């Protein structure tokens, strides 16, 4: 079946808000056998939305609209779809009471315009929004499926997973089974990856390299008329890539580097402290984004200046004078001293030049110290100041992951 996603809102067209809804929905629809061939972004203009929706009716089987279900005058999605399908909007009393209860629970007064959100196209099903006021809507008309979802990503995902996805699985006629996964790589470029994977050919399978900043993700796709065959093909493809790229693979699908590091520390019963110069606390910030990190991450110090390195972490003056403040030796001193300061099993130290001035912009040194020895990573990263710092964080976390897996 052919799918289409229509995203509604001036804020999307004008670039104020990143449209993550379309990405999420495309991934989800692919998994259940709906091939998304079209995406449109339409502003808060009634005639434009009617025209866009009419076009989608002529070419797509499943049409999902996001946004424009709010209480204000520029929220026009229901009105535009109802005009195209020649449906009246009727007050749904149950939905009206749910919206009133939502405000009562928050101890807030419901505005009169929120009543607008309880109007539903005649014959449509309500997709209950458990975390917001805008309900989703599900319409079957002849051979078309039309769904409307709230715009806020958290609400959209909740309504899709709880309400819309089960209906789609029940109602659609899949033209086969699609399976996909993602393999995540660090330390190898897209062109190098392409050289390695170009000889891997499995019928009805596809590998799509996606170059990200300092990483490459491989999107794997498998198709078959039989679900088990689709899964087996995908597994075979994953195994082949694991064999060829094992030294660069750090994760799969929804894995996050910081979560892998924290969970591995937990599994091994180890503790960590970090001393950062160039990255200014970004590594510590990433680690503390993970729930339960306090069990293994004891703390960090940003020793940005030479004085801070000397006074906060008692780095040797001789080391700084002989090797400079950006060097393997200074990073080792930071790692060693932070480990002692926080009495942890592992210490990590990082120094570098984030730029934009200087001859060695992008150079960084990360040293990891533990009871089993030390590990050193040095790279020169491209990009501006922010990109370099983010890249150093990713590379350092990956080096820590490798240190823990040794």
From Swiss-Prot:
Domain of life where this protein originates: Bacteria
Protein name: Putative competence-damage inducible protein
Matching Gene3D superfamilies: 3.30.70.2860, CinA-like, MoaB/Mog-like domain
HAMAP family: CinA_B
Organism: Natranaerobius thermophilus (strain ATCC BAA-1301 / DSM 18059 / JW/NM-WN-LF)
Family label: Belongs to the CinA family.
Any Pfam family matching the protein: CinA_KH
Disulphide connectivity of cysteines: none
InterPro entries on file: CinA, CinA-like_C, CinA_C, CinA_KH, Competence-induced_CinA, MoaB/Mog-like_dom_sf, MoaB/Mog_dom
CDD domains according to UniProt: cinA
Gene name of the encoded protein: cinA
């Amino acid at each position: 079946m052919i799918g289409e996603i229509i995203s509604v809102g001036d804020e999307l067209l004008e670039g104020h808000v990143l449209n993550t809804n379309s990405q999420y929905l495309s991934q989800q629809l692919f998994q259940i056998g709906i091939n998304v061939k079209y995406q449109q972004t339409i502003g808060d203009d009634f005639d434009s939305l009617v025209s866009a929706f009419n076009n989608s009716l002529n070419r797509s089987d499943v049409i999902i609209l996001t946004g424009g279900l709010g209480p204000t005058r520029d929220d026009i999605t229901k009105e535009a779809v109802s005009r195209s399908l020649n449906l009246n909007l009727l007050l749904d009393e149950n939905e009206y009471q749910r919206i009133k209860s939502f405000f009562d629970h928050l101890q807030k007064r419901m505005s009169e315009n929120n009543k607008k959100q309880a109007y539903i196209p005649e014959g449509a099903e309500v997709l209950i929004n458990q975390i917001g006021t805008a309900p989703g809507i599900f319409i079957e008309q002849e051979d078309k499926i039309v769904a409307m979802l709230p715009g806020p990503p958290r609400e959209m995902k909740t309504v899709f997973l709880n309400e819309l996805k089960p209906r789609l699985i029940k109602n659609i006629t899949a033209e086969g089974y699609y399976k996909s996964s993602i393999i995540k790589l660090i330390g190898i470029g897209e062109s190098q990856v392409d050289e390695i994977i170009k000889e891997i050919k499995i019928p009805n399978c596809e590998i799509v390299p996606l170059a990200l900043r300092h990483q490459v993700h491989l999107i794997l796709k498998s198709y078959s008329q039989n679900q088990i065959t689709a899964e087996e093909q995908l597994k075979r493809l994953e195994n082949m890539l694991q064999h060829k790229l094992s030294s660069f693979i750090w994760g799969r699908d929804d894995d996050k580097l910081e979560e892998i590091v924290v969970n591995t520390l937990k599994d091994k019963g180890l503790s960590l402290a970090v001393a950062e110069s160039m990255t200014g606390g970004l590594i510590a910030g990433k680690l503390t984004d993970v729930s339960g990190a306090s069990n293994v991450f004891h703390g960090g110090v940003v020793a940005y200046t030479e004085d801070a390195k000397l006074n906060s972490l008692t780095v040797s003056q001789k080391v700084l004078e002989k090797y400079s403040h950006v060097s393997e030796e200074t990073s080792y001193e930071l790692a060693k001293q932070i480990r002692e300061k926080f009495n942890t099993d592992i210490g990590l130290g990082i120094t570098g030049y984030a730029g934009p001035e200087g001859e060695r912009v992008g150079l960084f040194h990360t040293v990891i110290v533990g009871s089993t020895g030390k590990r050193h990573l040095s790279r020169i990263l491209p990009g501006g100041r922010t990109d370099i710092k983010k890249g150093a964080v990713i590379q350092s976390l990956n080096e820590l992951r490798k240190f823990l897996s040794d």
